[in-house]
Swiss-Prot record:
One of its GO terms (molecular function) is NADP binding. PROSITE patterns: PROA. This is Gamma-glutamyl phosphate reductase. Keywords: Amino-acid biosynthesis, Cytoplasm, NADP, Oxidoreductase, Proline biosynthesis. PANTHER family: DELTA-1-PYRROLINE-5-CARBOXYLATE SYNTHASE (PTHR11063:SF8), GLUTAMATE SEMIALDEHYDE DEHYDROGENASE (PTHR11063). It comes from Enterobacter sp. (strain 638).
Length: 417
């Protein structure tokens, strides 16, 4: 089955690579229209997925992530239309010039070819990834979470109908419908067809892909994010940033998980933090020095275990640790961070610059929330993932990250001397 899917995707990728921006936008507009016009079958499939998820005892938070309704589906369709408005990077000349040999050389952006994505149980990801891949002239093979396999299958069928209406092969966007986990292992070895693989899930999935895949893998999305409260931080602005970074959407990978508080500000800052976290419903997990300053406050607090510094909570839980100085804070981030997003709150320019230069994360912030690590917030439009590695992309992966480049030489019967 996967062999046939791979061959179909590769064949489709050659046709997609030749499309103009106008033609690709026409396809995306058609997909958006079809998602709205054929919403009933997608919503019916989603109801079946939700019923099975409830029977399996999934949490209310997870059920909310799985659920679609007419308003959410319209929002997803509108997101596809927004992709139409993004600049198409394909065909862009990055650089070039005339060489001494007389050869005119240029480096031009081109599609990757076939992109494989393994992702969690969020039905919107199916459409997001498909639209970004099509905009950049790539075919896509998608393997969504087993909790939404019916929703994903119904959504991809609608996308394929739109593709065929525009004269393009259905193989341009395909979904592995079976929830059989063995198919993931098979997908990881499809280097004959898939040019890049992006896993969007937990640490276990990322580890599996790194160890088993014969395809280049872009990993990321696991966010053990930190905020350092420097000794010069102003308490009220700092609390505002921390509340935003922790409570706006706790289940996202750019949510702060550990707070590192300078010892010289801890006595005044931590009681204020306790009050704010109590109002926000956040449970604090504190080291001994922080615990002594928090235990009489209104926030729920308990002693932190060392392994919790490596946890991506994705919930209203926050580690709090008192550090001796900026060196101590940076050392902690180097040991426990995931190179996703880290921030410092300071009024000392020198400390901000040190943090920028010494914390090796895909996004670092000075006096700002970690929640900004997002394709839309960065002005990239939608994103296919957030990469925490250094090759081939880093940070939010927008359209440009779904391209590579080729060297093109124009000669006049030119030969090498």
């Amino acid at each position: 089955m996967l062999e046939q899917m791979g061959a179909a995707a590769k064949a489709a990728s050659y046709k997609l690579a030749l499309l103009s921006s106008r033609e690709k936008n026409r396809v995306l507009e058609k997909i958006a229209d079809y998602l709205e016009g054929q919403s009933e079958q997608i919503l019916l499939a989603n109801e079946q997925d939700l019923a099975e998820a409830r029977a399996n005892g999934l949490s209310d938070a997870m059920l909310d992530r799985l659920a679609l309704n007419p308003a959410r589906l319209k929002s997803i369709a509108d997101d596809v239309r927004q992709v139409c408005n993004l600049a198409d990077p394909v065909g862009q000349v990055i650089d070039g010039g005339l060489l001494d040999s007389g050869l005119r050389l240029e480096r031009r952006r081109v599609p990757l070819g076939v992109v494989g994505v393994i992702y969690e149980a969020r039905p919107n990801v199916t459409v997001d990834v498909a639209s970004l891949c099509l905009k950049t002239g790539n075919a896509a093979i998608l393997r969504g979470g087993k909790e939404t396999w019916r929703t994903n299958a119904a959504t991809v069928k609608v996308i394929q109908q739109a593709l065929e209406e525009c004269g393009l092969p259905a193989g341009a966007v395909q979904a592995i419908e079976s929830p059989d986990r063995a198919l993931v292992n098979e997908m990881l070895r499809m280097d004959k067809y898939i040019d890049m693989l992006i896993p969007r899930g937990g640490a276990g999935l990322h580890k599996l892909c790194r160890e088993q895949s014969t395809i280049p893998v872009i990993t990321g999305g696991i966010g053990v994010c930190h905020i350092v409260v420097d000794d010069s931080a102003e308490i009220e602005p700092a609390l505002k940033i921390i509340v935003n970074a922790k409570t706006q959407r706790p289940s996202t990978c750019n949510t702060v998980e550990t707070l590192l508080v300078h010892q010289d500000i801890a006595d005044t800052f931590l009681p204020a933090l306790s009050q704010q976290m109590a109002e926000s419903g956040v449970t604090l997990h504190a080291d001994p020095r922080a615990l002594a300053l928090l235990q009489d406050g209104p926030a729920k607090v308990e002693a932190v275990k060392s392994e919790q510094y490596d946890d991506e909570y994705l919930s209203l839980d926050l580690n709090v640790k008192v550090v001796a100085d900026l060196d101590d804070a940076i050392a902690h981030i180097r040991e426990h961070g995931t190179q996703h997003s880290d921030a410092i709150l300071t009024r000392k320019l020198s400390h901000g610059n040190r943090f920028i230069n010494e914390v090796d994360s895909s996004a670092v912030y000075v006096n700002a929330s970690t929640r900004f690590t997002d394709g839309g917030q960065f002005g990239l439009g939608a994103e296919v993932a957030v990469s925490t590695q250094k090759l081939h992309a880093r940070g939010p992966m927008g359209l440009e990250a779904l391209t590579t480049y080729k060297w093109i030489g124009y000669g006049d019967d030119t030969i090498r001397a």
